[in-house]
Amino acid sequence: MRRVLVMQRIVVVGGGAAGIGAAGAAKAADSAADVRVYTEFEDVGYSPCGIPYVHGKEIPDFERLFLATKATYEATGIDIRYETEVTGVDAGKQTISVRGDGTTSYDKLIVCTGFDYAPVGVPGADLDGLYYVKNIRRAMEWDKVLDGVKAAVVVEASPLGLEMVTALCHRGIETHLIDPDAWALAAATDPDIAAPVQDSWRELGAHLHFNTTLTGFTGENSVRSVTTSDGEIRCDLAVVCTKKVANTALARAAGLKIGSANGVMVDEAMHTTTAGVWAAGDCIEVPHSVSQIPIQGLTGSHAYAQGKVAGTNAAGGQRKYQPVSVPWGMMAGEWMIGGV
């Protein structure tokens, strides 16, 4: 009797570092698999961490941030559906709902829906002129806008916020940073470590407003000032760099279990609590190697590694992801700051 080989369909939702890592690993583990990536955006597989450095003219162009070309993905046999939004998952029937295209079945599903920014929750948040650094096409558009910006306010001294302060100063823009803490990266650094970094920003011309809370954005159609607990700052642009939060809307709707850090719960194989469904990247939580406490919102490198684990296992291979220690480092002003 002739044995019939059935091609398995592995669907990846999300085209960031985790999604592309998952798709590539799945195809490597099972070259015959029908591997599909669905992304609501125009591009996949780039480094969002590099966006501030293009804005600051330290990296010459955005094209250098892409991991590969669209032709490269086609050549590897990965089917990427660009500008195609997945709106629902029926884990029982093993189908996804695609906006404007009905339902599609899957054998294995990998959820890599990434992150959103924590909402600022203040009046004026719907005005034009608020920039959320995330999507590379939007970053390209904003980069042209920066040529005409005279003054900008960066909201919160997150790692991304620190990079944007430096980038805007390098563009010759009057730059203000507001943050409710007493110094930059207060949750991760001591004040004596942050002090020389803050001094280097002041030397670049930045205005630092610590112990200062955002209270609103004002303007008729576009933002013209930022209001704070310490007064008003006139500006042409506000860069919102609030905390990253896991985008779990699709996962919750699919019935995946969400953990204490508000990320999708996974095991060391990146398998979720639902059969046939894996997850990776900024939408999940993983244990810290020392405390074993779940943590969420790591780096693109972590997301890519998690994606490779998820993709390998979804395709039938075996790979484990170990608890993370989270060493980190970043440029801040003229300094490199980091920890472990």
Each language-model region and where it sits:
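Residue-level detector of alpha-helix initiation sites
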Residues: 16-20, 42, 115-117, 137, ...
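Glycine-rich dinucleotide-binding loop and its adjacent helix/turn
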Residues: 113-171, 266
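Mid-to-C-terminal Rossmann-like scaffold of FAD/NAD(P)H-dependent oxidoreductases
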Residues: 5-9, 15, 28, 283-340
